[in-house]
Amino acid sequence: MNTVNYLRISLVDRCNFRCSYCMPTGEAIAYLHRSQILSYEELLFLVGEVFLPLGIDRFRLTGGEPLLRRGVVGFVRALVGLPGVADVSLSTNAYLLEELAEDLYAAGLRRVNISLDSLDPGVFARITGRDHWSKVWAGIQAAHRVGFDPLKLNVVVLPGINEQEVPDLAALTIDRQWHVRFIEFMPIGNTGYFEQAGWVNSETLRSRIRERFGLGEGACYGNGPADVFQIPGAKGTVGFISQMSECFCSRCNRVRLAADGFLRPCLLNEADQIDLKTPLRAGAGAAQLRELVSELLLRKPEINFRERDRGTTGSYGRTMSQIGG
């Protein structure tokens, strides 16, 4: 089992999209009140006094949609500036990125992951519930222009909806140093839709790309979940995150902090998550909080392998947007 050195921080559970794979269709979402969400000051304390001393020095900001939270640029600047922070990245739907890309880059952010599930505006609207393709594409172009590198585009592949676009999306990597990652649809966020639609395995997607362009040998870089390939002669890469068909639990190096302060050891695991907000607001010191986190980290290998054996068959109380992806 890899050393855990990576924390995904959900800044907010709200989102301005309603993606079919992320939120239950037709159901109201009970969003958190502002007082229930960890403040920026609390987050910086946890990072500086709890996570960094435990060797966790890589951070990704997620949501919901993290750019919806007021003051996000200032928080990025403060987080990047903490002594010992090795890397800060951000996942976004890019709706607000055209306006914020320059400020985020100036604040020290260098890496962004952007959700782009279709190149067809109509299909995009069907998946996201919003007719915002042009604004998202403008946000992607702004991120490219400002200089974010690597610039990664994440595609959740949905059977019969956007799976036919996989080769066209992969082609974005040919002339640009972009990295397009195809993600197997999994039953967190909208289990009813998953049961209805199913999923497409990564090897099928690779075969389709290989038929049109060819595809080099795959590799796994670092501790990330993606298996990375390259179209011959392309500037960028294509990756496959295969949580349904190709288990990568053994190389997992991350934990997830929800906006309300629950620390989750595994995307699939709710039973073992711990509450950091309550003891923090009750006056617990850094040493006590570090002990809580340390105990969870010690149990993470056993939790990971238990979840791997169980598979994605559980009942999940939180949507993907509430977990932070």
UniProtKB/Swiss-Prot annotation:
Binding site residues for [4Fe-4S] cluster 2: C249, C252, C266
Protein's pathway: Cofactor biosynthesis; molybdopterin biosynthesis
Spans traversing the lipid bilayer: none
PROSITE patterns the record matches: MOAA_NIFB_PQQE, RADICAL_SAM
GO terms under biological process: Mo-molybdopterin cofactor biosynthetic process
Family, per entry: Belongs to the radical SAM superfamily. MoaA family.
Stored CDD domains: Radical_SAM (cd01335), Twitch_MoaA (cd21117)
Protein name per the record: GTP 3',8-cyclase
Binding, [4Fe-4S] cluster 1: C15, C19, C22
Endpoints of the signal sequence: none
Residues where GTP binds: R8, R60, S91, K152, R254, V255, R256
Cofactor(s) of this protein: [4Fe-4S] cluster
InterPro entries: Aldolase_TIM, Elp3/MiaA/NifB-like_rSAM, MoaA, MoaA_NifB_PqqE_Fe-S-bd_CS, MoaA_twitch, MoCo_biosynth_MoaA/MoaC, rSAM
GO MF entry, a single one: GTP 3',8'-cyclase activity
Described function: Catalyzes the cyclization of GTP to (8S)-3',8-cyclo-7,8-dihydroguanosine 5'-triphosphate.
EC number(s) from the headed UniProt entry: 4.1.99.22
SUPFAM superfamilies for this protein: Radical SAM enzymes
Residue ranges of domain Radical SAM core in the record: 1-226
Domain of life: Bacteria
Catalytic activity: GTP + AH2 + S-adenosyl-L-methionine = (8S)-3',8-cyclo-7,8-dihydroguanosine 5'-triphosphate + 5'-deoxyadenosine + L-methionine + A + H(+)
Note on how the cofactor is bound: Binds 2 [4Fe-4S] clusters. Binds 1 [4Fe-4S] cluster coordinated with 3 cysteines and an exchangeable S-adenosyl-L-methionine and 1 [4Fe-4S] cluster coordinated with 3 cysteines and the GTP-derived substrate.
Entry keyword set: 4Fe-4S, GTP-binding, Iron, Iron-sulfur, Lyase, Metal-binding, Molybdenum cofactor biosynthesis, Nucleotide-binding, S-adenosyl-L-methionine
Cross-referenced Pfam families: Mob_synth_C, Radical_SAM
Major enzyme class: lyase
Subunit annotation: Monomer and homodimer.
Protein residues bound to S-adenosyl-L-methionine: Y21, G64, S115, M186
